[in-house]
């Protein structure tokens, strides 16, 4: 927070002016005898620096209520490292914004260097081999701070189902991948760490979800569940008046101070030292709902090794004007920094930084030179530890929501707070470290299918990508189809159908558990004679278990295979049945608001786990 002399109440007593009680707001004047000495000094100071409105009507409140509010203000002061200093910092941010000054004024922008990794190329295969060798030395950090209300799901977003074929939640899906990585690539007797970043609203739902489901097979000791202890106050105008709840004058509504606070929290909890003792080399930060979150990992590790990166962002192609954050390289005074810029300010920043056309330029393929940020990053643990030790993990803050410049002294349309962003760890690196920041550039169909919007077409829709739970589910099915076709399997293309106004091809819907296929090379090992594998466009196929081999298959219907550890399943032959069908549904009738459901008419189920024979053949 800076090198300032301080006291328990967060201001400097030797510069505190003495003034008579008569100068205090009426509500505070008649409450001083109820407060401790520290609380009295704090409230006086708040009154003097333009926050006297906090105490309006205090004289009408019961004594116990005023005492409790005094306790709350004192606690808030300590958590913020001095509420007065916090207010002054907020005023500086607001003054700069009102003056039209971006934090990036004086910087030059340029597109990051990109080289697209494509399936089928030699480097793609080599990247997978190299990356897989290090996957067991990765600790995973999930950003699960979001509720799903903005996408029509009234719970923690990480609890949303990835697909309706298996009804697997994102949280379970991620744990499945981590456990598969641990088994395949982990060190003997070492568990891969899984850190879950939560918010005030998602902590309990996620904690209970894990407990109720026995942590989905993961050992509780390898899961760290973090939540910030400090929310930050909001402000109502350019003079930085603290927002007071109009319906309850004893409440100062606050919000989480952005996911950037987790770097400081990871530092405070000493997790980096614990992970280092486990032999961890990298931290993989990823967001709460991306059905392809783990597909990019080996390629990111490879790129980090190849280019000697200490911080590596995952990026995908992006169209100009697309409402996704973008990766931008900024330079000033011989200092370079790679940042993930929010789409709301991207156009403005680019114009400030010499790109006069802003976010409208594109290449011959119609894509912006500034690729989309996926909020996924791979950090070298040794570098991360040094950065946290040096900075405490404190990041620059920005205004959220951005107030209108036309409002000036009037109240903002909605209260504004100062927040920090998890991905801005790049801004506190040393210059020599900042020079070792880059991106792994992949096609979205292999790396990025997030849930960010409601499941419906809108009047604003153009040719921009739509990121919702429907498209994320369909992207997962399509990913498996693409890989099977790439190795020579014959997989029919499904018919395009409309769901909630979106034209999609969900069929055939294929779900392969990470224990079955974790990497592209696994598909080649499991499907031993690809030309002998045919899957019709109406088919459904679900497979779990490492020891499942498919030598030949003609599938027209639904096949589900579940193979426990120590057993083997070989698939060969022809299967035809009524199958499962994805059909349109009233979006209001399903908890997932997807606009379709799975009609489970008929299936062939193979389970290997309790039979006398270790081998089952279809």
Q: What do these predicted ranges mean?
A:
Residues 2-137, 304-618:
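Left-handed beta-helix
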Residues 114-139, 150-420, 425-426:
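Domain-scale recognition of functional cores that engage charged ligands
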Residues 145-147:
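N-terminal regions that are enriched for targeting/export leaders
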